[in-house]
Amino acid sequence: MEATLNLEPSGRSCWDEPLSIAVRGLAPEQPVTLRSVLRDEKGALFRAHARYRADSHGELDLARTPALGGSFSGLEPMGLLWAMEPDRPFWRLVKRDVQTPFVVELEVLDGHEPDGGQRLAHAVHERHFLAPGVRRVPVREGRVRATLFLPPEPGPFPGIIDLFGVGGGLLEYRASLLAGKGFAVMALAYYNYDDLPKNMETMHMEYFEEAVNYLRSHPEVKGPGIGLLGISKGGELGLAMASFLKGITAAVVINGSVAAVGNTISYKDETIPPVTILRNQVKMTKDGLKDVVDALQSPLVDKKSFIPVERSDTTFLFLVGQDDHNWKSEFYADEISKRLQAHGKEKPQIICYPAAGHYIEPPYFPLCSAGMHLLVGANITFGGEPKPHAMAQLDAWQQLQTFFHKQLGSECLHVSPKI
């Protein structure tokens, strides 16, 4: 009997969907190795492998059969995706073009040899970033440079602006996936894209105000207010937008700073200067990476750099990786909570994830624990451990959807934190 590798869904799925992986037609108790490989848009290969043993019927199902070792061990149905590692050091898996899928190749090899035995079965699966019917609409309105993703069914939908970090450009993959959940999501560029400024010396809130007004006035966006979703620098900018601008009902901040970092934030006649960088506090890890977690002065000392969150009437959710080494995300979330409550504002929800690092992405993206930081100009450690980080991403994705459905007025069941 020939071995078969069975996937469900079989040929394609959305990136954030679970994938069922099973093998049939093996010998009873046969030892095998499963391998996965994905090539990104720049040609880098990401790989994972795990050793398994078939049951007495010659079958194994990753949802019921524990891995015996390899890139991960134990019962990990999606480990062949989240445990992938790049063949290039310090390389982060990023989807640049959401109109094409990532192609994942899976294979079953005989035995547990490190280099792999005879190939017994093989399958190819497409992981898509646009759910069927999701509409992708490039936006060039006034100064706004963005891409709007709309669900397939008729609107209006709850609206969300999505912001990434200091890498600049326009990343669409989180917005495109979220649009498949019933939201109108606009991925917003703010520098180093098209005709936008090439650097971040000053972040003018008027640009972001234009983006907010555009999305709020869109005929397929439900009012009166919209949501913000930001990670890292995008979280910092989301806090500034919620503090200075009108029409923002809800904001999710993923590992964001409460201080202006590396640039000035300005709105009308107000300016927030960047927090002081403490270069003597940059440490080196045993792997030769820079650790910058202590390299920013506390905004409790540099008080002028503290974003005035007390002005905001936005409802906040903070998602925090407790092993974030980019900066002190948990400290920032706690200080924001104290400041809001001291001014009679609603206490924000803070969900902390132990051993999760800086880049909390949609589910199944591999952990990027180290890489180039543009403001530092060197490879730094971002923190995190693969399994707890993967579990954090899974939970955070559900939490932010539940939060936005509740705050922006659409129905969704509550999701309890898993960690």
From Swiss-Prot:
Keyword Oxidoreductase: no
Keyword annotations from UniProtKB, A to Z: Cytoplasm, Fatty acid metabolism, Hydrolase, Lipid metabolism, Phosphoprotein, Serine esterase
Pathway membership, UniProt: Lipid metabolism; fatty acid metabolism
Phenotype upon changing residue 324 to A: Abolishes activity
Cell compartments where the protein resides: Cytoplasm, Cytosol
Record Gene3D superfamilies: Acyl-CoA thioester hydrolase/BAAT N-terminal domain, alpha/beta hydrolase
Induction profile: In the liver, by peroxisome proliferator (Clofibrate) treatment, via the peroxisome proliferator-activated receptors (PPARs) or fasting for 24 hours.
Biological processes, Gene Ontology terms: acyl-CoA metabolic process; long-chain fatty acid metabolic process
Main subcellular location of this protein, as a coarse class: cytoplasm
Active site per database record: 232, 324, 358
Modified residues (Phosphoserine): 416
Subunit-structure text: Monomer.
Family, similarity comment: Belongs to the C/M/P thioester hydrolase family.
Entry protein name: Acyl-coenzyme A thioesterase 1
Organism from which the protein derives: Mus musculus (Mouse)
Gene name tied to this protein: Acot1
